[in-house]
C-alpha cells in the first residue's frame, strides 16, 4: 500500500519559476490542503526513526511547526520553534541562515545546555536552514540526537554532512520535473 505522503507528492501541482520546477505540497507550503491523514503518516514515520529519549524537538518556522506539533502530541515531548524574529529573551541564540532563495537570521530560544534534541523539518534542499539550526543548537550546548526531514530534494543532505558532520534521515527523496514529482526513494 502506498504511503499518503508519496501519493500526495506524486499528484502535486508544478509551477515554473525561471528555470526552477517548484512543487506545491501541503508539507512544504501548507496548500492546497493539509489533511490529518497526511500529517499522521509523516508523524508516525518520523517517530519510528527517532530516539524518543530526548528532552525537546526543534524545528524552524514555518512548515516544520505542524510536523513538530504532531510528533509532540504523539510522544509528549515538548517542541521549540526557531523563529525569524528576535525576542530578546535571556539565552537567545541568533544564527545566520542562507537558503537557495533567501538570507536572514534565525533565533533559538528554550534550549538549555545539555538538552537532548531531535531536529525535524519539512524539506531539505540546499541544507541552509538545517545547517543554521545545527549551529544554533551547538552554540546553545545541546546534544543533537537525530535529524529528520520529510522531503529530500537536491544535494542538501550531503552538504549538511560535509559541513556539520551530522547524518540526516529523510522520509522521501524526490526529483521535480516539469511533468511532476518523481519519488526516487521512500523510507
Swiss-Prot record:
A GO MF label: guanine phosphoribosyltransferase activity
Compartment(s) of residence: Cytoplasm
Enzyme Commission (EC) number: 2.4.2.8
Family annotation (SUPFAM superfamilies): PRTase-like
Known pathway: Purine metabolism; IMP biosynthesis via salvage pathway; IMP from hypoxanthine: step 1/1
Catalytic activity: IMP + diphosphate = hypoxanthine + 5-phospho-alpha-D-ribose 1-diphosphate; GMP + diphosphate = guanine + 5-phospho-alpha-D-ribose 1-diphosphate
Main location: cytoplasm
Positions in coiled-coil regions: none
Keyword Electron transport attached: no
A GO BP entry: purine ribonucleoside salvage
Keyword tags: Cytoplasm, Glycosyltransferase, Purine salvage, Transferase
Designated name of the protein: Hypoxanthine/guanine phosphoribosyltransferase
Organism from which the protein derives: Methanococcus voltae (strain ATCC BAA-1334 / A3)
